């Protein structure tokens, strides 16, 4: 029964971690509205609203490429595609709608009142001739996750990236079958209508989509060297992979639910001098060393000694954590 209880708690924790990722909306794109060509400021990226005179700036990107070629710039510096973004909506209003539908206690979730910022609901990537690229349509995970809660009228929903990928694929397939091109800002409405139909959204107000400004669409030029997608998460893939496979892994369950156990004795090894001395005793050191002209640092050596010693170590080592460049791979080689 205890194992079942821990497994259930573990699943809740994974769902919470996923929601943390989903509830981090991508930054609203910063556009380069003018770009320097010599001493001139040339119109470049563009917003679109009901009063706009700007068209989709594909010609501007091509013209600037020609200018760069004349300056003998490398191909990597040339613009070869653009992202068109739909909407400029208030995060606060959207999350408030979710809280209302889920009947959340607003005193308990008072931080919702402090929310600010804006988000877009999807992007569509096109080449400089208006043809939709392989990247195509990408629905915002933040928009999708909050919408799922609004539709379910509850926060206990299992949101999977696979569902978002499937939605993107279905929308892209419809666009492909109908040979849809994005030659003007208003063509994005075709994409929006397909997505709203798929998600069964009858109106923006129904789901709490309220404009943060009069901007309806935005277009940002991309160079060959630029990141393809705006919707990236470093952790989501890993969390979902672990969530699918954790049930038969006792160490993983124990690690994930460790904070639920009471009366834990934690040792902060970097400040506990007695513990440092204990693990730096002569008999704790390995008999050999990985060939290298470098020696491990103090904390690396302590970690190595702990890892190779079965004495006075009650728990199995589960993971090696740390920011990039802190010596994790070196540490594992030494162990």
Q: Where in this protein do the model-derived segments appear?
A:
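Hydrophobic anchor at the beta1->P-loop junction of P-loop NTPases
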Residues: 320
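Walker A (P-loop) phosphate-binding loop of P-loop NTPases
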Residues: 325
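N-terminal accessory nucleic-acid engagement/regulatory domains that precede
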Residues: 1-285
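N-terminal pre-P-loop "Q-motif" helix
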Residues: 292-312, 316
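Conserved lysine of the Walker
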Residues: 328
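Phosphate-binding glycine-rich loops of NTP-binding sites
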Residues: 334
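Short interface patches used for recognition in eukaryotic signaling and trafficking proteins
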Residues: 286-291
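Hydrophobic positions on the alpha1 helix immediately C-terminal to the Walker A/P-loop
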Residues: 331
């Amino acid at each position: 029964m205890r194992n079942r209880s821990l497994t259930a708690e573990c699943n809740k924790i994974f769902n919470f971690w996923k929601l943390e990722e989903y509830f981090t909306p991508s930054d609203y794109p910063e556009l380069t509205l003018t770009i320097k060509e010599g001493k001139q400021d040339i119109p470049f990226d563009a917003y679109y609203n009901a009063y706009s005179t700007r068209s989709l700036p594909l010609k501007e990107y091509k013209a600037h490429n020609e200018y760069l070629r004349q300056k003998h710039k490398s191909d990597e510096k040339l613009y070869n595609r653009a992202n068109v973004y739909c909407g400029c909506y208030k995060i606060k209003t959207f999350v408030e709608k979710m809280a209302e539908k889920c009947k959340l206690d607003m005193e308990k979730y008072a931080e919702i009142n402090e929310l600010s910022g804006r988000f877009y609901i999807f992007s569509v990537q096109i080449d400089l001739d208006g043809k939709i690229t392989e990247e195509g349509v990408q629905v915002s995970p933040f928009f999708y996750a909050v919408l799922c809660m609004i539709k379910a009228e509850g926060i206990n929903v299992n949101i999977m990236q696979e569902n978002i990928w499937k939605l993107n694929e279905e929308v892209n397939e419809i666009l492909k079958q109908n040979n849809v091109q994005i030659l003007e800002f208003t063509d994005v409405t075709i994409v929006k209508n397909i997505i709203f139909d798929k998600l069964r959204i009858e109106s923006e107000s129904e789901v709490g989509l309220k404009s943060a400004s009069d901007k309806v669409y935005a277009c940002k030029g991309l160079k060959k060297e630029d990141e393809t997608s705006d919707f990236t998460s470093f952790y989501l893939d890993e969390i979902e992979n672990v969530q699918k496979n954790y049930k038969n892994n006792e160490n993983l369950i124990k690690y994930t639910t460790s904070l639920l156990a009471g009366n834990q004795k934690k040792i902060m090894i970097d400040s506990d001098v007695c513990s440092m001395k204990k693990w730096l005793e002569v008999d704790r050191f390995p008999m050999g060393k990985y060939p290298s002209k470098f020696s491990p640092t103090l904390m690396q050596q302590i970690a190595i000694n702990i890892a190779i010693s079965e004495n006075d170590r009650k728990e199995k080592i589960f993971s090696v954590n740390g920011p990039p460049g802190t010596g994790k791979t070196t540490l594992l080689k030494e162990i």
